[in-house]
Swiss-Prot record:
HAMAP family: EF_Ts. Associates with the EF-Tu.GDP complex and induces the exchange of GDP to GTP. It remains bound to the aminoacyl-tRNA.EF-Tu.GTP complex up to the GTP hydrolysis stage on the ribosome. GO terms for cellular component: cytoplasm. Its main location: cytoplasm. This is Elongation factor Ts.
Amino acid sequence: MANYTAADVKKLRELTGAGMMDCKKALDEADGNVDKAVEALRIKGQKGVAKREGRSAENGAVVSLISEDQTSGVLLELKCETDFVAKGDKFQAVANTLAAHVAATSPADIEALLASEIEAGKTVQAYVDEANANLGEKIVLDRFAQFTGAYVGVYMHRTMPDLPPQIGVLVELDKADAELAKGIAQHIAAFAPKYLSREDVPAEVVEAERRVAEETTRAEGKPEAALPKIVEGRVNGFFKEATLLGQPYALDAKKSVQKVLDEAGVTLKRFSRIKVGI
């Protein structure tokens, strides 16, 4: 039997995140040499990563990080295969570390984030791959949002009490209003608007909605003379449903979100809603 101590096993577990039996086996095969055991476990872990590539990662968590002065914020989704891993401390620590890295480096997009160095000589992609190996599940990082402005608010929603947040919303206002920011963010979490305003809806989407409205109206046998007005009404209904500013406000359905903002003298600059797996 190789010559090593319980302290060596503990050290190896801390260095690699591997289980106790795997660490003992690696030390046996490495004749008690911790460095060689680390290398062997990492090679084994990378083989496991390759095997997990074809698996689906639809569970996970959304994490957030807001600056103390609330002028900047990060929202990040990290996915895994099971809710068991998602609610574990190790997985959530990885997610929070990644969010802190985004806050510190402000990557332009997901490609830039994955290619950036989170530690000396280690990219974010390599860091995620290590988490994949250590946690024994496919771990995926492919989405984040980062806002900087006059005031940034966040709302995190748990769909199950024993799981980490599955929905996160980031909002940017042109002035500080914590209560309004929270209310708007909660509304976004619940109603999932696709766009901020009419102006943000792509022209091709509007045209597609208009064509559907025309075909539906004709199929209903409506008079041709009434067609333009009916179609316009249906397109306006689409805008009301799909745009945040057009939706009835969740906390006061008699007012639109735009009306609530106008009454508060606040402009909502942008928002981001992330739901795990969607």
